[in-house]
Amino acid sequence: KGMSEDYIKNSCIPEMFVGADFTPADGWLMGLGAHMISLKPRTSTEWKEQTFKVNERMTAFSYEAHLKYSGRNYTFAAKTLMASALDHTALLGGYGVSSVDSRTGEQGYTPFRHSTTWVNFAYGTKWRPGVFVGYTKNLGTGKSLVSADKVYGMGLDIDQLITVSLNVSYNLPHWKFGFEYCPATAYYGTTDLESGRIEQTHAITNHRILGLMMYYF
């Protein structure tokens, strides 16, 4: 039935994240984290003109590492993420049907795995230019898929995504003015059912221009 909070309500297992940050020296911040989500997409199914109660569950784990260094007038930050089914956080991801019980219609699921890495650098105080570069790669699924139509999530027909952001801000007491240009290229294709990876891709590029004016109280 599409996006719904019922999947995690039916699961009765809360979404969990455990992380730790470290400050090994002045200006440095490093950290690690692990995430778990467990969903029950359905509790019953209509199959061969009958209604069956089913016990379906999709559980996925994600892991991340990040670091940041803040100098006197510059900042560098980076993060890498091995994500599974984190589409509810606006990342590419989701899951697909990996098996169907021929007797009851009960389905098994497999999450898509995506690797995402980004770096960001900004320099200056009053005038502060910055650059952001991000890359996401679809690593497929752990099990084969039943059908390319039985996948659920966001951007599951994208093999890789490359994003660059060039930005500059002008900072005053209580005021901030900014400008950003952000091209993003996504490689769309068809899903290989055996691996969950995307093949026969073609690139589409989107260009975004953003202006900002902010007043701080």
Give the role of each language-model region.
Residues 14-18, 61-65, 115-119, 162-166, ...:
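Hydrophobic, lipid-facing positions within transmembrane beta-strands of outer-membrane proteins
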Residues 142-145, 178-179, 187-201:
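A glycine-biased, small/acidic residue-tolerant capping/turn segment at secondary-structure junctions
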Residues 7-8, 55, 201:
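Alpha-helix capping and helix-loop boundary segments enriched in small/acidic/polar residues
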Residues 167-189:
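C-terminal closing repeat unit and adjoining cap/tail of repeat-based domains
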Residues 26-158:
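Detector for outer-membrane/organellar transmembrane beta-barrel domains
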Residues 12-14, 22, 34, 38, ...:
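A subset of solvent-exposed loop/turn segments in beta-rich extracellular surface proteins, enriched
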Residues 1-22, 90-107:
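Surface-exposed coil loops of outer-membrane beta-barrel proteins
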Residues 172, 203-217:
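Outer-membrane beta-barrel "beta-signal"
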